[in-house]
Amino acid sequence: IISKKDKYAVVSAGETVTLPGYSFETTGDDEPEVEWLIDDNSIAALTTSKVDGKLTGEVKTLAAGVAVLTLQVKDTPADKDNYYIVIKPKNAPSSCTADTTYNTVSLGWSKTADADGYTITRKVEGSDTEQTIAHVDGTDTVSYKDTAAQTGISYIYHVYAYTKYTNNGQTDYANTDTYASVKATPQLGKAAMTSVTAEGYSSLTLKWEKVDGATGYIVYRSTDKSKVDTQIMDITNGAVSYVDTALTAGNTYYYKVQPYCVVNGKKVYGDASGILSGKPLP
């Protein structure tokens, strides 16, 4: 019945939609009398009138949701056709936060009361290519963990609110025009030294905890606690201990360890550990 091929209109709340025209295959001179019906007056208001014998109508959208408009032949409900008006949420989330670990960004955002859920997009900083990475169903579901991010790469995340609907048998999402945004760079965890012990003559043994994703560790040493910045070893074999030799007995040595991984041929560093000290045996 409805002449328009695309029977979905996606709009923002407050917009007015003009209903499409219609036609019938009839053998007589007169077309049957028809009427427009709406399924939910709380999200949209329907007004109709006749112009040159044709029924026309407008729909004033009020709130987020999917309004189903039915054009049917009066007294013959089987002769009908539907037109769908998808109304986006009024507002996007107002804020978004991000926590990072190795190859992971954990997002959180403020709730949007009239949303069916949220669309998450991501792009590399400096790029114009925005990629949809998730649709999160549920008004109250306000977090998402991106485990496909890469350590050392800066990303821009956008969070949209959406109205969910079915379009020709396929699930689709009507996103808000605005969004909450946050920048995040996944990074290695902080190193943690566990001990510096004198186990041999003029030497100290350093131990630390394994950092997830680290491919190596830089060991720093100094005799000045306020300036532990001299690199003495680059551990590349995944070891989490190191024996520092040829030290002077009786002196106090200060150490810290910094993890790193290699991304696109470059070292990306995590935070260095706290400082521990030790004295070699005489």
Residue positions per predicted region:
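Pro/Thr/Ser/Gly-rich low-complexity, intrinsically disordered linker/stalk tracts
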Residues: 89-113, 151, 168-213, 249, ...
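Beta-strand-rich modules
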Residues: 146-167, 244-265
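An aromatic-rich alpha-helical recognition segment common to small helix-rich domains
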Residues: 93, 109, 120, 146, ...
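Extracellular acidic loop/turn motifs
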Residues: 24-33, 114-117, 127-128, 213-215, ...
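Extracytoplasmic soluble-region selector
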Residues: 1-89
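Recognizes extended acidic, P/S/T-rich segments that occur
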Residues: 119-151, 218-248, 264, 271
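Beta-strand signatures of extracellular beta-sandwich domains
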Residues: 35-37, 117-121, 160, 216-220
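Extracellular Ig-like/FN3 beta-sandwich strand-entry sites
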Residues: 16, 64-68, 115, 152-154, ...
